[in-house]
Curated annotation (Swiss-Prot):
Keywords on record: Carbohydrate metabolism, Chitin degradation, Disulfide bond, Glycosidase, Hydrolase, Multifunctional enzyme, Polysaccharide degradation, Signal, Vacuole
Function: Bifunctional enzyme with lysozyme / chitinase activity. May have a role in plugging the latex vessel and cessation of latex flow.
Family indicated by similarity: Belongs to the glycosyl hydrolase 18 family. Chitinase class II subfamily.
GO MF annotations in UniProt: chitinase activity; endochitinase activity; lysozyme activity
Protein name: Hevamine-A
Enzyme Commission number: 3.2.1.14, 3.2.1.17
Domain GH18: 27-302
GO biological process, alphabetically ordered: chitin catabolic process; polysaccharide catabolic process
Source species: Hevea brasiliensis (Para rubber tree)
Lineage: Eukaryota, Viridiplantae, Streptophyta, Embryophyta, Tracheophyta
Top-level taxon: Eukaryota
Length: 311
C-alpha cells in the first residue's frame, strides 16, 4: 500500500512538473476591458484568473495641445473624478501577477501626435497621471499601471516611435514601464510600423481580424498563418500574440471558432519562440461567448501532449 501511495505521489509530482514547465514556456491571454459597462469591474475581470494581461481601453483624446481624456464607456465618469476607484481594481490585478496597461487610441477618438515635442508632452502626461510620476489629477487614482498599450488606428502616422522612446526611458527611474501594441495584421502597420522597429515593445498583440488578406476565413487558415509568420520573423519584440475577436459579433470579420483555434492554428503558431498567447477583444464579448474558457488550457501549455502521455 505504501509503495502504491509513493508511486501515485511521484506520478502527481511528474505531472505537476511537466505542466509547470510547459506553462512557463507557454502563453497567456490578454483582454481589453473598459468599453462596456456590462462587462463587470476590473476586480471581477482579474478574479476569473483567465487573463495574464489587461488593457484598460481607452485614452482616446490626446496630443496636439488637447486636454487628454479617458473614455471608459459605462464604467465611470472620469470628468467628475468617478474613475479613481479603478485603482482598487488595478491593485487587485497586480497582486495576482496580472499586468495592467492603459491603452491609447482605439477605433474612435481624437488623438494624434503633431511633433517630437508633442510626443514628449504626452509621455510626461502619461508618466505623471498613470505611471510612476506625481499629479493631483490622476484619472484612475493613485495605482501605478504596468505600462502603456498603443492601439493607434487613425490620426498621424508619425512620432509614435518617439513616444515609445520617451516612455521606455522612464524605466530608468525604477519600475519598468512595459510597452505593448495592437497593430493591424497587414504588414507593416501603417501607424505603428516605425514604433515597432525601435525594438522597445515587450508584447505585441496583432489584430488578425477585420482584414481579410491576413485573417481566418471559412476554414482557411493559410492567410492567418502566413501573416503570423511574417510578423514573428520581421519585428524585434519580446512576445507576439494572436489577436482575435472573442465572439462573432465582436468584429466585422475574422472570428475563429475555438475548435479551429485549438486544433489547427495554435499548434502552428506555437512553433515560434516569440509565441506569447492570444489577445481577445473584448471582456464584454468574452463574457457572452465564453471564448477564453474554451481555449485557456490550450493557450497556456506548449506541450499538453506530454501531460497526456504521462497520464
Amino acid at each position: 500500500m505504501a509503495k502504491r501511495t509513493q508511486a501515485i505521489l511521484l506520478l502527481l509530482l511528474a505531472i505537476s512538473l511537466i505542466m509547470s514547465s510547459s506553462h512557463v514556456d507557454g502563453g497567456g491571454i490578454a483582454i481589453y476591458w473598459g468599453q462596456n459597462g456590462n462587462e463587470g469591474t476590473l476586480t471581477q475581470t482579474c478574479s476569473t484568473r483567465k487573463y495574464s494581461y489587461v488593457n484598460i481601453a481607452f485614452l482616446n483624446k490626446f496630443g496636439n495641445g488637447q486636454t487628454p481624456q479617458i473614455n471608459l464607456a459605462g464604467h465611470c465618469n472620469p470628468a467628475a473624478g468617478g474613475c479613481t476607484i479603478v485603482s482598487n481594481g488595478i491593485r487587485s490585478c497586480q497582486i495576482q501577477g496580472i499586468k495592467v496597461m492603459l491603452s491609447l487610441g482605439g477605433g474612435i477618438g481624437s488623438y494624434t501626435l503633431a511633433s517630437q515635442a508633442d510626443a514628449k508632452n504626452v509621455a510626461d502626461y502619461l508618466w505623471n497621471n498613470f505611471l510612476g510620476g506625481k499629479s493631483s489629477s490622476r484619472p484612475l487614482g493613485d495605482a501605478v499601471l504596468d505600462g502603456i498599450d498603443f492601439d493607434i488606428e487613425h490620426g498621424s502616422t508619425l512620432y509614435w516611435d518617439d513616444l515609445a522612446r520617451y516612455l521606455s526611458a522612464y524605466s530608468k527611474q525604477g519600475k519598468k514601464v512595459y510597452l505593448t501594441a495592437a497593430p493591424q495584421c497587414p504588414f507593416p502597420d501603417r501607424y505603428l510600423g516605425t514604433a515597432l522597429n525601435t525594438g522597445l515593445f515587450d508584447y505585441v498583440w496583432v489584430q488578425f481580424y477585420n482584414n481579410p488578406p491576413c485573417q481566418y476565413s471559412s476554414g482557411n487558415i493559410n492567410n492567418i498563418i502566413n501573416s503570423w509568420n511574417r510578423w514573428t520573423t520581421s519585428i524585434n519584440a519580446g512576445k507576439i500574440f494572436l489577436g482575435l475577436p472573442a465572439a462573432p459579433e465582436a468584429a466585422g470579420s475574422g472570428y475563429v471558432p475555438p475548435d479551429v483555434l485549438i486544433s489547427r492554428i495554435l499548434p502552428e503558431i506555437k512553433k515560434s519562440p516569440k509565441y506569447g498567447g492570444v489577445m481577445l477583444w473584448s471582456k464584454f464579448y468574452d463574457d457572452k461567448n465564453g471564448y477564453s474558457s474554451s481555449i485557456l488550457d490550450s493557450v497556456l501549455f506548449l506541450h499538453s501532449e506530454e501531460c497526456m502521455t504521462v497520464l
